[in-house]
Amino acid sequence: MPLERADFVGAIWLTTPILVLLGSKTPRHLRWILLLPFGGSCLLVAFAFPFGPDVAKNYTFGTVFYVALVNFNLLVLEDPYLEHKWTQPTSDGKEHQQPFHSLGAWDRIRWCFDNALSTRGIGWNWRTAPLPSAPAPGTSKTAFLRLSMQRILQQYMGHDIAAGILLWLTHDGKMGVLELDFVPRCIATACWWASSIAVMDIGYHFACMIGVSSGLFWTRIEEVHPVNGPWAECYTLSRFWNRTWHQNFRRGLQIPSRVVARRVVRAPRGSMLSRQTQSYFAFTLSGLYHWAAAKMAAPSESFTRTLTFFLLMPNILLLEDLVIRFAQEKLGWRGSWWRVVGLVWTFLALTILSTGFVNDLVAPGLVTAFPALRMSPTYYMLNTMVENRG
């Protein structure tokens, strides 16, 4: 079979640790030069190899935009060899930080690969915030493998229910999400979010089981955090993005957003201005590379709803912050009962606002979030119920 662009995605991701390793031997003011061969290689792949017939596979090539962003962050915006340190727990419960220049040659290579491919900063001093709870310290390998299998089964059940409902509502994918009436449209949109995140968590936990059981990677069980947090934490949109939705691509957006907030806007750290600046910039960047990736995979589609969703979201988050602050300071709403209202708000806001974005992914077949296996108990049960009624 002839090679196509998506076949080079893995190689493109490997450029990050290689460039970080080369950057350790390069003066900081010259590291940007390393981006030139990276850009040239990406252009060569784009012009020399065509897209294949699988639209979903073609969409994965769009991650080249994220890789380019991460490479720019590590080589230009940051000095990882001074700012990033491995963390190692000590016997007294504290953390020992290992700088890059204190390591031997082999450990420096491991450091570069670990840093480049660690999207959430687990085991590093720059860990992204806040991650779902990991197994307790002292958990044995056997107990961890058992917990992981339970997690995988739970996630698959959630995935099958959500994916089966989504497939059934869209009539085997023949109907777009936007073509549905309001209530089924909201349900279908929520099912897409739940189905897609569950698949990510399942794949991640299989990788964790391999790493822990073999002893090759991710061997510190107490740092093997799940990908997605509990849905009960979604009583605000902000908590949905910060705690429940996957954090795998947060790093690439967080670094330039902080640079803009602190160096350009000069907002005080932790202030409302800093938070909103980072929110607006991160969602804008995310929207642009989601749109560009989708446009490359399906050039005939406009994907304007994708851009609209990402540009609208920070405004809604700002409005949410202001309303919560007013309710707490002026109305004294601090009880736990208001979380029920918050869960309803998050469900309605997310499903209504993201319907166009989800339709942009489902209709062309970019990310359908349909059942991972051919046999879906949920889909079979729904079809059987309809046939029995008929």
UniProtKB/Swiss-Prot annotation:
GO molecular function (one): O-acyltransferase activity
GO biological process terms on file: lipid metabolic process
The EC number(s) this enzyme carries: 2.3.1.-
Keyword presence, Amino-acid biosynthesis: no
Biotechnology comment: Fusaproliferin shows cytotoxicity against pancreatic cancer cell lines and provides a new chemical scaffold that can be further developed to obtain more potent synthetic agents against pancreatic cancer. Fusaproliferin and its analogs show also anti-inflammatory activity and can be hit compounds for the treatment of inflammation-associated diseases.
Localization, UniProt: Membrane
Membrane topology: Multi-pass membrane protein
GO-annotated cellular components: membrane
Pfam families found in the cross-reference section: MBOAT_2
Name of the protein in question: Acetyltransferase FUP5
Native species: Fusarium proliferatum (strain ET1) (Orchid endophyte fungus)
Gene from which the chain derives: FUP5
